[in-house]
Amino acid sequence: MHYPSLYTFAAPDHWRAAPLFTTSCEAFLASFKVWNSATAGGNICMSLPAGPMITMTVALEATYTLWAADGSERTVDAADFVTGNHENILGPGEILRRVNIPISALRKRHTHRRFTLTQLGRSTLFMIATQSADMTDLLLTVTAGTTKPVRFSFDSMPDAETLQQSIDAIPEAVWFDDPNGTPDHRRHLAKHYAEEIRIELSAGVRS
């Protein structure tokens, strides 16, 4: 699907997390020409840390169907597809054929945080959190600041210390280092935003 189609997609009202389509499209840094011709699948397969379609699909618990040259298919969790900066699990001749987002994920509450050095700059950190309608669990996805997506799943809302420890447990080698941010800066942002998200969703703010 091209970005303009996803950006303007009219989702059913009960897809509470559908605004993340627009949010993620807006996080895609490109020229007008590229933005209007780029595809969600292409962004995923480029497998760059700041790929917003990676962020969105991992946060929405998507699966990818991969199609091999011999016609065989395999289905993988979106969270397992990207393995590093510009690296993924695609084999020779294999393509991304389909992205499937479960309806159950689209019905969840959501919030996000994104940091850039400039207003229209590349993401230094992009985090999305979702929560079931009963407002007890938490699914937190960390991207852009890491070389591959990191997704935390909590059956119940964690306390502040547990959440901070989870961020600290991300291996040093996974934090991305480039002119948009050092690993220490990105870790600091992740811990700060994680606590903001925890407070927001714990308060029962509807989204």
Please provide the spans of the model-predicted regions.
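C-terminal structural segment of proteins
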Residues: M1-S207
